[in-house]
């Protein structure tokens, strides 16, 4: 008997796979537990439609992430901080401050998505990586000046 998996099933397959199983396994386990549906032509067409729709949404989100990355790449943030005589900051520039600066520039970004290679504790020009999407990241330029 052929079934379409609705869940990942160990030693059988992943979501959306069409697999051939024993009729008893399908009737007594997979179908009642909701792990699979019978592989009829109607269900197969619905599965293909759902896959196409999911792929379309995925591409749309990826395209929006690429546009946001281009916008972030074009930005250069300037942060004024108090510093001592040797240009060392009192404190450090954090990803939270960078998120607030991005918000002031019209880009809403969670601070956890902004990654600093090392803490910014001196005056100068630095870069930070912004992880927008698992496949898309942008480099943000940050200039730290004396307040």
Swiss-Prot record:
What are the UniProt keywords, alphabetically?
Ribonucleoprotein, Ribosomal protein, RNA-binding, rRNA-binding
Function per UniProt: Binds to the 23S rRNA.
Q: Which NCBIfam families match?
A: L9
Q: Which PANTHER family match?
A: 50S RIBOSOMAL PROTEIN L9 (PTHR21368)
Coiled-coil stretches noted in the UniProt entry, renumbered to this chain: none
Q: Name one GO molecular function term.
A: rRNA binding
Query: What family classification does the UniProt entry report for this protein?
Result: Belongs to the bacterial ribosomal protein bL9 family.
> Which Gene Ontology cellular component terms are annotated?
ribonucleoprotein complex; ribosome
Q: Which SUPFAM superfamilies match?
A: L9 N-domain-like, Ribosomal protein L9 C-domain
What name is this protein filed under?
Answer: Large ribosomal subunit protein bL9
One protein family per Pfam: Ribosomal_L9_C
Q: Which gene is the coding source of this polypeptide chain?
A: rplI
| GO BP annotations, alphabetical order | translation
């Amino acid at each position: 008997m052929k079934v379409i998996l609705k869940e990942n099933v160990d030693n059988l397959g992943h979501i959306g796979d069409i697999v051939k199983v024993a009729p008893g396994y399908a009737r007594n386990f997979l179908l009642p537990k909701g792990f699979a549906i019978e592989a009829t032509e109607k269900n197969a067409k619905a599965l293909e439609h759902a896959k196409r729709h999911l792929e379309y949404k995925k591409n749309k989100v990826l395209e929006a992430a690429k546009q946001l990355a281009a916008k972030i790449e074009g930005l250069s943030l300037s942060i004024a901080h108090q510093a001592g005589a040797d240009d060392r900051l009192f404190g450090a520039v954090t990803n939270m401050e960078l998120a607030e600066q991005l918000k002031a520039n019209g880009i809403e970004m969670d601070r956890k998505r902004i990654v600093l290679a090392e803490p910014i504790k001196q005056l100068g020009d630095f870069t930070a990586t912004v992880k927008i999407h698992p496949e898309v990241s942008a480099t943000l330029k940050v200039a730290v000046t004396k307040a």
